[in-house]
């Protein structure tokens, strides 16, 4: 294990991260909201930490293998999440405990969107901008992590793809080097962000809010600059714009890359994961619209459809924006939408959850077993697109599902043990392990009422969800540390 080379990389990341404090610092200057000191302090502290880690090891160029890759990925999120908590700790408004500061930082960086803050409308603009920025940078990291790095390590939904499928693979990357891949992906990411911000601005959203919500929309994060979330703007047009960009961001970025490379829009519909993703969204929209209309929750059919469309896409893509309190909806719908987050977005997207591709393969395997009951001697292969998948891939899906279920059950029991009621414990684990954000019960609006121990468990869940479980679990195996 090349610890010095790993330390050099982590130090460099912290130095780069310190530079991002300049942006909220400028916002503090523009709005004169008094929050600039917190970001100035964080800049110098982060720069010092990064320099201490990087300078003594700056000439270490040891060849990094997959084991080092796992450790670097985990350290990337844990170290930056910890440094990201500093502005919340240094800031006088909001006055957060250390636990809440870490919760807010990790929630932002992992694009979970769960919050302990109340009174967002009265917070300094710089703090509000910083929360949105955390999610946006987290989303940039997720795209490269999901599409370029984890497949090389043999982890993540993208490893399920093979040569004829769009997107980078272990044996067929978009670009020969991660740096090249990252540049292409980030270009797409930035273009989508600019397009989203302009669309929201033209729809009547103030410039500050438009930029902030474009950050959290493209990152599928869910943080807002207002307590009422997107409902603050009370605009069906804004609801529709955000929902459309959430759907775009919930797609595999490999498909966006294919379109950017000159291929036709048909590349999307040829992808079985994309077809299932859209199918799930449409089915949920129809169900929600019919139930809301039957119960006369809204005055008109158009309002009902708009609210159903927005809320379904927001929850099912794991963004977690709200336009209305879904607690006043028939209980069936909030629970259905919470469970839809288990499916989440496509592999290679900023969405959370199990990922559509895994759910698709689980269904295909279930269907195969039913056929085998009728024809025990028949040989059935499972295909993705036009290619039969090897059993090793299918075993990996079941392995991931088992590990995910184990983490889910252990987390829920641990939170119940801290004194949280069972329904709220279930909802909080669903919201954090799937990187969704809002839950039900005592965490329907925010997580401020959760006890400190439960919050640390939920922080761990955010990391498990964002790092696709195995990336974090492998560090706890003796084999990983054995030379």
Curated annotation (Swiss-Prot):
Residue intervals on the Cytoplasmic side: 1-2, 58-65, 151-177
Q: What domain of life does the UniProt record list for this protein's source?
A: Bacteria
Q: Where does K(+) bind?
A: 111-112, 220-221, 318-319, 435-436
Periplasmic-side segments: 30-35, 116-124, 203-205, 225-234, 323-330, 418-419, 440-451
Say which species the protein is native to: Salmonella typhimurium (strain LT2 / SGSC1412 / ATCC 700720)
Q: How does it sit in the membrane?
A: Multi-pass membrane protein
What are the start and end residues of every segment in region (Selectivity filter part 3)? 317-322
Entry function:
Low-affinity potassium transport system. Interacts with Trk system potassium uptake protein TrkA and requires TrkE for transport activity.
Where does this one sit in the cell? Cell inner membrane
Q: Which UniProt keywords apply?
A: Cell inner membrane, Cell membrane, Ion channel, Ion transport, Membrane, Metal-binding, Potassium, Potassium transport, Transmembrane, Transmembrane helix, Transport
Give the gene name.
Answer: trkH
Instruction: Please provide one cellular component term from the Gene Ontology annotations of this protein.
Output: plasma membrane
Extract the ranges annotated as region (Selectivity filter part 4): 434-439
What's the protein called, per UniProt?
A: Trk system potassium uptake protein TrkH
Q: Which residues lie within the membrane without crossing it?
A: 98-109, 110-115, 206, 207-218, 219-224, 235-250, 301-316, 317-322, 331-342, 343-355, 420-421, 422-432, 433-439, 452-463
The text of the family note is: Belongs to the TrkH potassium transport family.
Please give the Gene Ontology molecular function terms for this protein: potassium channel activity; potassium ion binding; potassium ion transmembrane transporter activity; potassium:chloride symporter activity
List all membrane-crossing ranges: 3-29, 36-57, 66-90, 125-150, 178-202, 274-294, 390-417
Coiled coil ranges (UniProt) are none
Alphabetical list of InterPro entries matching this protein: Cat_transpt (IPR003445), TrkH (IPR004772)
Instruction: Spell out the residue ranges making up region: Selectivity filter part 1.
Output: 110-115
């Amino acid at each position: 294990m090349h610890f010095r080379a790993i330390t050099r990389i982590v130090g460099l990341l912290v130095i780069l991260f310190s530079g991002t404090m300049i942006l909220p610092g400028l916002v503090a200057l523009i709005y004169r909201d008094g929050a600039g000191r917190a970001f100035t302090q964080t800049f110098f502290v982060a720069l010092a930490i990064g320099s201490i880690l990087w300078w003594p090891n700056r000439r270490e160029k040891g060849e990094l293998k997959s084991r080092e890759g796992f450790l670097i990925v985990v350290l990337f999120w844990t170290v930056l999440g910890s440094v990201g908590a500093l502005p919340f700790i240094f800031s006088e408004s909001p006055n957060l405990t250390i636990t809440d500061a870490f919760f807010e930082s990790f929630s932002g960086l992992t694009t979970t969107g769960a919050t302990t803050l109340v009174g967002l409308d009265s917070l300094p603009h710089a703090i509000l901008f910083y929360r949105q920025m955390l999610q946006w940078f987290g989303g940039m990291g997720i795209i490269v992590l999901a599409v370029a790095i984890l497949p090389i390590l043999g982890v993540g939904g993208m490893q399920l793809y093979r040569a004829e499928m769009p997107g980078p693979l272990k044996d067929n990357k978009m670009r020969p080097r991660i740096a090249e891949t990252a540049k292409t992906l980030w270009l797409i990411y930035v273009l989508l962000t600019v397009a989203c911000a302009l669309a929201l601005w033209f729809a009547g959203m103030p410039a500050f809010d438009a930029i902030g919500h474009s950050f959290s929309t493209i990152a599928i994060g869910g943080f807002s600059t207002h307590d009422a979330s997107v409902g603050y703007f009370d605009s069906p047009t804004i609801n529709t714009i955000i929902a459309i960009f959430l759907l775009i961001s919930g797609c595999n970025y490999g498909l966006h890359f294919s379109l950017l490379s000159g291929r036709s829009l048909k590349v999307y519909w040829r992808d079985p994961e994309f077809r299932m993703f859209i199918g799930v969204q449409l089915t949920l929209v129809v169900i929600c619209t019919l139930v809301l209309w039957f119960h006369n929750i809204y005055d008109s059919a158009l309002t009902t459809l708009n609210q159903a469309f927005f809320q379904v896409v927001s929850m099912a893509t794991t963004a977690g924006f709200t336009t209305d309190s879904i607690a006043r909806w028939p209980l069936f719908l909030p629970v259905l939408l919470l469970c839809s987050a288990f499916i989440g977005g496509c592999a290679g997207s900023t969405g959370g959850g199990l990922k559509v591709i895994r759910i698709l393969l689980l269904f295909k395997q279930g269907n195969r077993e039913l056929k085998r009951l009728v024809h025990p001697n028949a040989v059935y292969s499972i295909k993705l697109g036009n290619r039969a998948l090897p059993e090793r891939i299918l075993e990996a899906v079941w392995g991931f599902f088992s590990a995910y279920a184990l983490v889910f059950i252990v987390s829920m029991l641990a939170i119940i043990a801290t004194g949280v009621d069972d329904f709220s414990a279930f909802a909080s684990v669903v919201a954090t392990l799937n990187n969704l954000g809002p839950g039900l019960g005592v965490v329907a609006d925010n997580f401020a009422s959760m006890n400190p121990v439960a919050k640390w468990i939920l922080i761990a869940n955010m990391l498990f969800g964002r790092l696709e479980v195995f990336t974090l679990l492998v560090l706890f195996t003796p084999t990983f540390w054995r030379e």
